[in-house]
Amino acid sequence: LDCFIEAMSGELEAVGFRTEAGFDGLHGHGVLWGGNLTVLCSLLGTPHWPRIEGGILFVEDINEHPYRVERMLLQLHQAGVLAAQKAVLLGDFGGWRKSPLDRGYTLKTMVAQLRAVCPVPILTGLPFGHVPTKVTLPVGRCVELQVLRRDVLLSWACDHDHDHD
């Protein structure tokens, strides 16, 4: 709640989180957009799809098995959505229960598979979704993404801020 109040009052200008190793030095800016992965996929191909290129896409979902998350992210990949972004930030994908049908297929495995086919950096660890402690994100604003070792900083008090239709 504090993060939301700070964001609404204009006091919050950045959020940070930790991701895996391998993205040190990543830097870019773009329009921050996204939300629930299932909802986004349901909009694909409709007039309501947000056509954003060069953005920073964030997604989350709940109660979806890794193979289903993979299917939805591959749908966005095959539609050219992921390749058109500067980066993809994965929030929380909890709430699902292991099943014998999963055969050990985990979210970590799914992320590795996606990274193998997608040319865009895919970062995990964004504290967003159905989690007790989450960040408030300025959807639709230009943000700057910086990674130093495993620390990710998303800031929106940047010089690149401008209106987007």
Describe each region flagged by the PLM:
Residues D24-G25, L32, W49-R51, V81-L82, ...:
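Solvent-exposed alpha-helices and their adjacent loops that cap or buttress functional pockets
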Residues C3, V31-V39, E64-R71, A83, ...:
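Conserved active-site and cofactor/substrate-binding residues in soluble primary-metabolism enzymes
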Residues H48-R103, L107:
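Internal helical hairpin/lid segments
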Residues L1-G45:
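Conserved anion/nucleotide-ligand pocket segment
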